[in-house]
Amino acid sequence: MAEDMETKIKNYKTAPFDSRFPNQNQTRNCWQNYLDFHRCQKAMTAKGGDISVCEWYQRVYQSLCPTSWVTDWDEQRAEGTFPGKI
């Protein structure tokens, strides 16, 4: 189990600096990367492409966003009440 934790820590990557969001508050950065991931996924699926190119956005929003926000947004997307334009 300790080896698993060490592997996770070694492979953990946080979100890199994004010049569009230079201030400490990263709420907008979280939101934008969540939207970008789902837009990328939708576009690549429509083209029949590989959605693995979208994984970068997913890693960033998972690093920045609280889990409860992501869960709520996923539920809203499933219900059709998500406020963002994807």
From Swiss-Prot:
Pathway: Energy metabolism; oxidative phosphorylation
N-acetylalanine modifications at: A2
Keywords for this protein: Acetylation, Disease variant, Disulfide bond, Membrane, Mitochondrion, Mitochondrion inner membrane, Primary mitochondrial disease
Chain location of the short sequence motif Cx10C motif per the record: 54-65
Membrane topology term: Peripheral membrane protein
Short motif (Cx9C motif): ranges: 30-40
All residue ranges annotated as the CHCH domain in the record: 27-73
Superkingdom of source: Eukaryota
Secretion signal span: none
InterPro entries: COX6B-like (IPR048280), CX6/COA6-like_sf (IPR036549), Cyt_c_oxidase_su6B (IPR003213)
Recorded consequence of changing R20C: In MC4DN7; severely reduced COX6B1 protein levels in patient muscle
Compartments, as annotated in UniProt: Mitochondrion inner membrane
Gene Ontology MF terms: cytochrome-c oxidase activity
Biological process per Gene Ontology, one example term: cellular respiration
Keyword Disulfide bond in annotation: yes
Family, similarity comment: Belongs to the cytochrome c oxidase subunit 6B family.
Function: Component of the cytochrome c oxidase, the last enzyme in the mitochondrial electron transport chain which drives oxidative phosphorylation. The respiratory chain contains 3 multisubunit complexes succinate dehydrogenase (complex II, CII), ubiquinol-cytochrome c oxidoreductase (cytochrome b-c1 complex, complex III, CIII) and cytochrome c oxidase (complex IV, CIV), that cooperate to transfer electrons derived from NADH and succinate to molecular oxygen, creating an electrochemical gradient over the inner membrane that drives transmembrane transport and the ATP synthase.
Disease affiliated with this protein: Mitochondrial complex IV deficiency, nuclear type 7: An autosomal recessive mitochondrial disorder characterized by encephalomyopathy resulting in variable clinical manifestations. Features include muscle weakness, gait disturbances, neurodegeneration, cognitive decline, metabolic acidosis, feeding difficulties, poor overall growth, cortical visual impairment, and hypertrophic cardiomyopathy. Serum lactate levels are increased. Patient tissues show decreased levels and activity of mitochondrial respiratory complex IV.
Name of the featured protein: Cytochrome c oxidase subunit 6B1
Taxonomic source organism: Homo sapiens (Human)
